[in-house]
Curated annotation (Swiss-Prot):
GO biological process, one term: chromosome segregation
InterPro entries: DNA_gyrase_B_C, HATPase_C_sf, Ribosomal_Su5_D2-typ_SF, Ribsml_uS5_D2-typ_fold_subgr, Topo_IIA, Topo_IIA-like_dom_sf, Topo_IIA_B, Topo_IIA_B_C
Site (Interaction with DNA): K504, N507, H559, R676
Ranges in coiled-coil conformation: none
Co-factor requirement: Mg(2+); Mn(2+); Ca(2+)
Residues involved in ATP binding: Y53, N93, D120, G162, L163, H164, G165, V166, G167, I168, K393
Protein name as it appears in the record: DNA topoisomerase 4 subunit B
Mutagenesis or variant effect for G124S: In coumermycin A1 mutant
Domain of life: Bacteria
Swiss-Prot/TrEMBL keywords: Antibiotic resistance, ATP-binding, DNA-binding, Isomerase, Magnesium, Metal-binding, Nucleotide-binding, Topoisomerase
Domain Toprim: 473-587
Length: 692
């Protein structure tokens, strides 16, 4: 099964593009983040005699060829998130120089032609011939060889996030034009590359006396990311600003061509990021005008002994949504890791110790989940040789990081509580209230899940699964009884439930609350989920691990998916934050030739399959599915519901773009058609194909 992440902004924009343009245009958009799987939805079936397997079938990939062939293995895909990951790789190298104490200035320049330049005043990439490959400069080795760099032996860098040979070489492979300048030992050098291949030798440009460091200028390859792909100035700006918060010893200067800012809101052409109080400055700005449980933000920074690294944190408790933004060596760890585990355990133990000190026995019931409820956390660690899960470094796996964080925060947290007894008691009572609410909810729930089902009187159209546990359970939301019938036959009855919807769900972005409350379709959906809405959402009451929107692969299906996503975003956003909401990817076409069958999700995929898979003799038959209900149960199972073969797109929310996402949802789904039309004109490449 393939699970690709898609932020909610991209999902809605992509779906709206399908609705508001002519149906025969292809799936391409500047903001669309549909990830094309490496294989068709259903791989073509061949007769055994059609295939050969011998020595000539084995291919050895050389140099950076694996990166171009499977970019998803290195940057997580070819969508907008992956595109901006290229910038992260380059600025991470510059930040490593700053953290190591060799640089204090980074310049970032975004041109209107989609060239991005990052310059630092560090030591500069070495340029002398490499001892292991004597006929090449070290710069060329770093740029063209995976797993080469100065961060493996721990001598050049005590802590680092990027690895020159993994990060910058991958960016080089995925750029159609890249130029690297190195100012080192009073000499200026330059080398050019294209798609990972040197286009020139190492050139010595002359003497420089007032400059040192590395300048990297690159242009993403349209063959990888698409013709209309462009950097988002707002995303680049926010990434750069966050790096400055993470290390208060660096100044980052931002420059952007005005032509590149035409669609960006409130992003200046020039800016300077420098924050002497680091994460505390960041959190104070984020929580401006918010009511906090304690008057002060708990923040600090600890340098560990024996060169093991450092920890910086800023923590506040408030009455809003909880989120944790953590980093390791300036790398954002979106999926958490061992450093977050250390933080959670330390805060729990500290509060329990304080409760014992003041004789509050009620605190015995609190857990780390109670402590972290409605907590806003910024956590940054710098450690030697960090171990991450996956190439994109979304989760920290270093075991020692937990101990480092615990040792760093334990004493400061104890002192913070002891020095402000009034605030500490207020916080403790607040956490105890969260724990008591949790226990009351548990007592109110029926022990047996099936009893709870009967008690709730779940919708009659719901075909529930047989297992009692939510772990591994899936709810498919489908449109209409016809599709529901096929899905019920195709499902695994043990863990897959089907909920057919009657017609299009209400657009909650434009409907009054009274109308939403009277909608039977919405009431059925809320009952089936079992987790409540808005502030009453309870993760532990959610009856399924995955909520999968499965609609037709046409315009109407996209519209229904947009309405459902809007409902989840406005009414149950925590369900999206927890990673429970997915989009199924059903096929639009069935292609057959002789004994070979394949399924295509859209027109461009169909054309690709016709060129690559159906090149033999014989009549090619192409059938277009009008809807899921037209598919046989075995076809639906094979292409869309079988975990081993299907593709799912996970919907996500970027915490730091929450306000922008709210505005986008309102513009696309709200009551003002002129705002929707304006948004499409400004943000979509399909404006010329509008069919209104």
């Amino acid at each position: 099964m393939s699970n690709d992440n898609k932020d909610l902004f991209s999902v809605l924009n992509h779906a709206q593009s399908r609705i508001d343009r002519k149906e025969n245009t292809q799936y391409t958009s500047a903001h669309s983040e549909i990830v094309v799987p490496a294989v068709p939805l259903s791989s073509p079936h061949h007769h055994k005699e059609d295939s050969t397997y011998n020595a000539s079938s084995i291919r050895i990939l050389e140099g950076l060829e694996p990166v171009r062939l499977r970019p998803g293995m290195y940057i997580g895909g070819t969508d907008s998130k992956a595109l901006h990951h290229l910038f992260s790789e380059i600025i991470d190298n510059a930040m490593d120089e700053a953290v190591a104490g060799y640089a204090d200035l980074i310049d970032i320049t975004l041109d209107s032609n989609n060239y991005l330049t990052v310059t630092d005043n560090g030591r500069g990439i070495p340029i002398e011939n490499h001892p292991q490959i004597p006929d090449k400069s070290t710069l060329e080795v770093i740029m063209t060889h995976l797993h080469s760099g100065g961060k493996f032996d721990g001598k050049a860098y005590q802590t680092s996030g990027g690895l020159h040979g993994v990060g910058i070489s991958v960016v080089n492979a995925l750029s159609d034009d890249m130029e690297v300048e190195v100012a080192r030992e009073r000499k200026l050098y330059r080398q050019r590359f294209s798609r990972g291949i040197p286009q020139s030798g190492l050139e010595e440009l002359g003497d420089v006396y007032n400059r040192r460091g590395t300048r990297v200028c690159f242009h993403p390859d349209s063959q990888i990311f698409g013709e209309n792909t462009a950097f988002d100035p707002e995303k680049i700006y926010k990434i750069a600003r966050s790096k400055a918060y993470l290390f208060n010893g660096v100044k980052i200067r931002w420059n952007c061509d005005p032509a590149a800012l035409k669609d960006a809101k409130n992003i200046p052409e020039k800016d300077v990021f420098y924050f002497p109080d680091g994460l505390k400055d960041y959190l104070s700005l984020s929580l401006k005008n918010k009511h906090l449980v304690t008057a002060e933000i708990f923040s600090g920074k600890t340098q560990q002994l024996s060169g093991h690294g450092s920890v910086e944190w800023a923590i506040a408790w408030h009455n809003g949504d909880a989120y944790i933004q953590s980093y390791c060596n300036t790398i954002p760890t979106e999926e958490g890791g061992t450093h977050e585990t250390g933080l959670r355990q330390t805060l729990l133990r500290g509060l329990k110790a304080y409760a014992e000190l003041i004789g509050n026995k009620r605190a015995s019931i609190i857990t780390s989940d109670d402590v972290m409820a409605s907590t806003v956390v910024m956590l940054s660690v710098f450690i030697k040789d960090p171990q991450f899960v996956g190439q994109t470094k979304d989760r920290l796996a270093t075991t020692e990081a937990q101990r480092i964080v615990e040792n760093a925060i334990r004493d400061p947290f104890d002192h913070w509580l002891a020095n402000s007894p009034h605030e500490a008691t207020k916080l403790l009572n607040w956490v105890i209230e969260r724990a008591e609410e949790r226990l009351k909810r548990r007592q109110d729930r029926e022990i047996n899940r099936k009893t709870a089902v009967r008690k709730l009187r779940l919708p009659g159209k719901l075909a529930d699964c047989s297992q009692n546990s939510a772990a591994g359970a899936e709810l498919f939301i489908v449109e209409g009884d016809s599709a529901g019938g096929s899905a019920k036959q195709a499902r695994n009855r043990t863990n897959q439930a089907i909920l057919p919807l009657r017609g299009k769900i209400l657009n909650v972005a434009s409907a009054a609350r009274e109308k939403m409350s009277s909608s039977q379709t919405i009431a059925d959906l809320i009952l089936a989920l079992g987790c409540g809405t808005r502030s009453k959402y309870r993760e532990e009451d959610l009856r399924y691990e995955r909520i999968i929107i499965m609609t037709d692969a046409d315009v109407d299906g996209a519209h229904i998916a947009s309405l459902l996503i809007t409902f989840f975003f406005q009414e149950i956003p925590d369900l999206i934050r927890a990673g429970h909401l997915y989009l199924a990817v059903p096929p639009l076409y069935r292609i057959s030739q002789g004994g070979k069958v394949a399924y295509a999700r859209d027109d461009s995929h169909k054309d690709e399959l016709l060129k690559t898979e159906f090149t033999g003799k014989g009549k090619i038959e192409i059938g277009r599915f009008k809807g899921l209900g037209e598919m046989r149960a075995e076809q639906l199972k094979e292409t869309t519901m079988n975990p081993k073969k299907r593709t799912l797109l996970r919907v996500s929310i970027d915490t730091f773009e929450m306000q922008e996402t709210k505005e986008t949802v309102q513009n696309l789904m709200g009551t003002k058609p002129e705002e929707r039309f304006r948004f499409i004109q400004e943000s979509s490449t399909f404006a010329n194909n509008l069919d209104i």
